[in-house]
């Protein structure tokens, strides 16, 4: 996120929703409206912890019809690289944060009427704004299936069951023996429905596997993953050919983080290997691809790399930057 794109916001409220999830309400210091967004959008939040910066993408879960405030929810991850832990431990009402403009990589498919949401855990967040954006009885039909570990981990359940879409909200609590039967769900859907999944990798994989067994078109499946990609590995050297800069990438640091700490500006959005914004060409060396953006053939070709999650297999990697 370049400085010119930063929006400085104040945290006006922090709520503990579950043992692991907090909701943060953000507003401009002067109370002016924030930039418009659509359901499924996220913002990149930048946090300064001493000399170290953390950059995390979070879905906007508030209504797109009211931009006086943004709301995000942050789950504290056990394997946090620092961002979620910082938000939980150091961010309170009155804290000022820098965010990027909203970007949407998870929009509803245009010209489709029936949209079915499948959420696991914190993966519920992008669907909250989708539901708030579209009133029941409108041009689109929305249906939510939300699975979570136990009653105390069911963030937003009370709001969903009291909301305008309550009749089409279905919850599944693992500790109570309730299971989301994906095969049965797919068999009940009309052929033109679009299905959206957001949650752990296992849930995403299960949705796609069940859809494939029934011959469901991939063009009608949409996913966003809410699980931290393992970006750690052995240290290596990255060379920015056009910039004439050589950097050491430590074991616990991504290439993108190393480049940013060196003061080099580079565009990025999701920082989870999904959107492709930070893709650059490989000039020398071999990448250890860990993204969800490149397909298997593209990864095997070793032509490009996503700097936010992937690493180097070789001791030295030269990129076109």
Task: Explain the meaning of each model-derived region.
Residues 2-96, 113, 148-151, 159-161:
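Ferredoxin-reductase
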Residues 39-41, 230-237, 274-276:
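A short, compositionally biased
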Residues 48, 102-103, 283:
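Short, surface-exposed secondary-structure boundary micro-motifs
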Residues 85-241, 248:
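FNR/FR-type flavoprotein reductase catalytic core
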Residues 236-267:
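C-terminal accessory/binding modules appended to enzymatic or scaffolding proteins
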Residues 260-262, 267, 276-321:
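Iron-sulfur (Fe-S) cluster-binding segments and ferredoxin-like electron-carrier domains
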């Amino acid at each position: 996120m370049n400085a010119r794109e930063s929006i400085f916001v104040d945290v006006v409220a922090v709520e503990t929703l579950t043992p692991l999830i907090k909701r943060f309400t953000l507003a401009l210091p002067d109370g002016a409206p924030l930039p418009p967004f659509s359901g499924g959008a996220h913002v990149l939040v930048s946090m300064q912890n001493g000399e170290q910066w953390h950059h995390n993408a979070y879905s906007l879960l508030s209504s797109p019809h009211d931009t006086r405030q943004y709301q995000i929810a942050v789950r504290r991850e056990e394997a946090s690289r620092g961002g979620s832990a910082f938000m939980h431990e150091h961010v309170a009402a009155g804290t000022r944060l820098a965010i990027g403009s909203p970007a949407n990589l998870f929009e509803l498919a245009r010209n489709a009427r029936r949209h079915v949401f499948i959420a696991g855990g914190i993966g519920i967040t992008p669907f909250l704004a989708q539901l708030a954006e579209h009133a029941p009885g409108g041009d689109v039909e929305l249906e939510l299936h939300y699975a979570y570990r136990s009653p105390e981990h069911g963030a937003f359940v009370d709001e969903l069951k009291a909301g305008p879409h309550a009749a089409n909200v279905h919850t599944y609590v693992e500790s109570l023996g309730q299971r989301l039967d994906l095969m049965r769900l797919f068999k009940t859907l009309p052929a033109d429905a679009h299905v959206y999944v957001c949650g752990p990798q296992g849930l995403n994989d299960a949705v796609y596997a069940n859809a494939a067994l029934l011959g469901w078109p991939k063009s009608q499946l949409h996913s966003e993953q809410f699980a931290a990609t393992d970006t750690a590995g052995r240290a290596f050297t990255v060379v920015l050919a056009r910039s004439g800069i050589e950097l050491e990438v430590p074991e616990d640091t991504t290439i993108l983080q190393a480049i940013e700490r060196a003061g080099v500006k580079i565009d990025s959005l999701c920082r989870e290997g999904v959107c492709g914004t930070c893709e650059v060409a490989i000039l020398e060396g071999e990448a250890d691809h860990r993204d969800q953006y490149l397909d298997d053939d593209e990864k095997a070709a070793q032509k490009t790399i996503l700097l936010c999650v992937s690493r180097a297999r070789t001791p030295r990697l030269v990129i076109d930057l």
